[in-house]
């Protein structure tokens, strides 16, 4: 259990995960092949959390700031053979029973959840996504679509690349954006992916030939 996810793991019926490097899977190949090799392990995590793999929602992740509505928006088949919502770098939903996932290897991933409702989200916020304030956009979409109050949200930033291993401190910018969006409960893993390769994949340190960590959020309907 990652300590930085603890604030989210206190929410009943919410499930979260962050799958780090899988040591026995060689990933010094191109992205699609690395993801193919990691897929059985990632699928097992989704199912271990109580979700059907047929209810697994992913974003295409194009380093932008568009947000998809999981369970509503249409999907396409990605290069790795699994469905994604095209053109988006974030997913939000209020539907229970869906598993949302984002892949990262230095970029930031942001978990969002409202303990007073079933509203949740997962965002890919690297240099470009942070510049475009994907977090602020996600909060506005939650307000518009679900009536979410920003002050009720819990936001968590996972491990990501940070100075001195990267010249842009986008983690600090994300913290500022959370405050500006009205988020009062913000938590940062304060961990650099490039400084701990036994635990994390790092696109920069491994020159692009590496795997991806998988972040997950979803809500299990009460029995």
What is the role of each PLM region?
Residues 1-223:
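Active-site microenvironment for binding and transforming phosphate-containing groups
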């Amino acid at each position: 259990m990652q300590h930085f996810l603890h604030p989210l793991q206190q929410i009943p019926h919410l499930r979260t995960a962050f799958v780090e490097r899988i040591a026995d899977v060689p990933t010094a190949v191109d992205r699609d092949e690395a993801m193919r090799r990691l897929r059985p392990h990632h699928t097992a995590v989704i199912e271990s959390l109580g979700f059907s793999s047929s209810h697994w929602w992913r974003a295409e992740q194009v380093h932008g700031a568009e947000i998809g509505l999981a369970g509503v928006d249409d999907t396409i088949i990605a290069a790795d053979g699994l469905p994604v919502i095209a053109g988006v770098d974030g997913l939000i939903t209020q539907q229970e029973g869906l598993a949302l996932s984002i892949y990262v290897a230095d970029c930031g991933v942001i978990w969002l959840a409202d303990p007073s409702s079933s509203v949740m989200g997962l965002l890919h916020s690297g240099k470009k996504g942070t510049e475009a304030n994907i977090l602020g956009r996600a909060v506005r979409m939650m307000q518009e679509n679900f009536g979410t109050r920003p002050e009720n949200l819990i936001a968590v930033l996972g491990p990501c690349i940070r100075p001195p291993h990267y010249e842009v401190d986008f983690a600090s910018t994300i913290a500022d954006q959370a405050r500006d969006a009205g988020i009062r409960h913000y938590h940062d893993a304060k961990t650099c992916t490039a400084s701990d390769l036994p635990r994390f994949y790092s696109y920069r340190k491994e020159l692009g030939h590496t795997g991806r960590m998988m972040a997950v959020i979803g809500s299990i309907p009460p029995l």
